[in-house]
């Protein structure tokens, strides 16, 4: 398989609240506004397919086609409007998700007839949903918004705001996105000037995420340099063991229950020698949404423990467009992805690859001066199974799992 094809497959496979940050006393204040947007129905926005999508009134029946979109809707408090969504281990951390109608196959593909039968007012389709599926729904008279892909945390912020406009929850969306953006900026600022360790993000099957990806941006915001750059990998692709060894990463990052690379060639790297391997939540690192701040905090705390310990985020410093009934419609395409945060901590079961992981969903509140629950951190030893033929097959199956996770 060529590197180009492999890269495309990897993108499809992987792309599928503010956590651990103390909010400053100004957190209860509104974010600084720099422009206005139309938040009154009807709303017309241009989607990733170039279609002008009009939502005539606040949707009462919403379908989400991927876990990331579901996460955002829950984050905005609009979960009661959801009538259909992916109902599986990748959305089980969302309260009440099991009561919704499942609209995807085991492979994460949309079930067109089921969706049409739900008579939705609006379908939210992340970019991993094919244009063909979107057009099938539109041909049946269904209103569908297909989002642009998220290649940075900034994209997540913009998608959250747009989702709020489409659902009639823009004020909540600006608050959620401001908290997300403030946390990210706080970690970036806290690690500015510090020595940046090198990091290898091991996705399994030899794949990694480059700097021009959502995951790569998380690594950068945590104050580290991605070894994928040395292999000229910008998005998702395979990276050779030789390059990893040559770059000698200070840290190796894995997600969920993915095995820690134990190739003998890596045994002399600093990461293995110093037992510097960190594990992040598989769903939150692969679902572009507000919960991205959880793996961000996990990584920043591992890479820069002293700097990350006292990080304080101030949402009041974040600029965001304010609603205006007479605002001109933006000429650029806007989009939104998905994220969610429950108002109470809960322990849920999430399947990663072929194993089950118990993960604690963090408490995210809107109270001033409150330190949010810390994301689950797990520093591991380098004694995972090697990548033999069987392990390679498992890795490929796991990659398919990540597609459904997004």
Please name every model-derived segment.
Residues 2-70, 170-200, 302-378:
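Bacterial Sec-exported substrate-binding components of ABC uptake systems
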Residues 42-46, 61-128, 133, 142-143, ...:
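A short, structured surface patch at a secondary-structure boundary
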Residues 47-50, 101-113, 150, 231-241:
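Short helix-initiation/N-cap motifs at beta->coil->alpha
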Residues 110-120, 139, 238-248:
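Short helices/loops that flank or line small-molecule/ion binding pockets
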Residues 130-203, 228-230, 281-330:
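Extracytoplasmic substrate-binding proteins
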Residues 208-236:
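Alpha-helical, coiled-coil/dimerization segments enriched in small aliphatic residues
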Residues 378-391:
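Juxtamembrane/start-of-transmembrane alpha-helix segments at the extracytoplasmic/lumenal side
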Residues 391, 397-406:
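C-terminal membrane-anchoring or membrane-association module
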């Amino acid at each position: 398989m060529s590197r180009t094809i492999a890269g495309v497959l990897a993108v499809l496979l992987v792309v599928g609240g503010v956590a651990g940050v103390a909010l400053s006393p100004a957190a209860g204040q509104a974010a600084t506004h720099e422009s206005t947007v139309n938040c009154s129905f009807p709303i017309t926005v241009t989607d990733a397919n170039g279609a002008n999508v009009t939502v005539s009134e606040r949707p009462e029946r919403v379908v989400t086609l991927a876990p990331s979109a579901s996460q955002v809707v829950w984050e905005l408090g609009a979960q009661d409007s959801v009538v259909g969504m992916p109902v599986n281990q990748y959305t089980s951390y969302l309260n009440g998700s099991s009561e919704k109608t499942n609209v995807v196959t085991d492979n994460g593909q949309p079930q067109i007839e089921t969706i049409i039968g739900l008579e939705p007012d609006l379908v939210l389709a992340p970019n991993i949903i094919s244009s063909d599926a979107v057009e099938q729904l539109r041909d049946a008279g269904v209103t569908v918004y297909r989002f642009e892909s998220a290649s940075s945390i900034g994209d997540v912020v913009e998608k959250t705001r747009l989702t709020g406009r489409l659902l009639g929850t823009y004020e909540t969306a600006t608050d959620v996105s401001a908290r997300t953006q403030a946390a990210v900026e706080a970690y970036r600022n806290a690690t500015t000037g510090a020595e940046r360790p090198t990091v290898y993000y091991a996705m399994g099957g030899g794949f990694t995420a480059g700097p021009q990806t959502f995951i790569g941006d998380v690594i950068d915001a945590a104050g580290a340099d991605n070894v994928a750059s040395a292999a000229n990998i910008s998005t998702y692709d395979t990276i050779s063991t030789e390059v990893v060894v040559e770059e000698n990463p200070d840290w190796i990052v894995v997600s969920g229950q993915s095995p820690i690379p134990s190739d003998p060639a890596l045994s002399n790297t600093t990461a293995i020698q110093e037992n510097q391997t960190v594990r992040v939540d598989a769903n939150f690192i692969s679902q572009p949404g507000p919960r991205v701040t959880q793996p961000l905090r996990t990584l920043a705390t591992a890479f820069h423990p002293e700097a990350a310990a006292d990080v304080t985020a101030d949402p009041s410093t974040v600029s965001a467009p304010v609603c205006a009934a007479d605002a001109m419609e933006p000429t650029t395409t806007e989009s939104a992805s998905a994220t969610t945060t429950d108002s109470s901590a809960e322990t849920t079961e999430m399947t990663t690859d072929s194993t089950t992981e118990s993960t604690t969903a963090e408490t995210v509140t809107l109270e001033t001066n409150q330190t949010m629950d810390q994301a689950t951190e797990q520093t591991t030893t380098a004694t995972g199974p090697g990548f033999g033929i069987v392990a390679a097959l498992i890795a490929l199956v796991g990659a398919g799992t990540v597609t459904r996770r997004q």
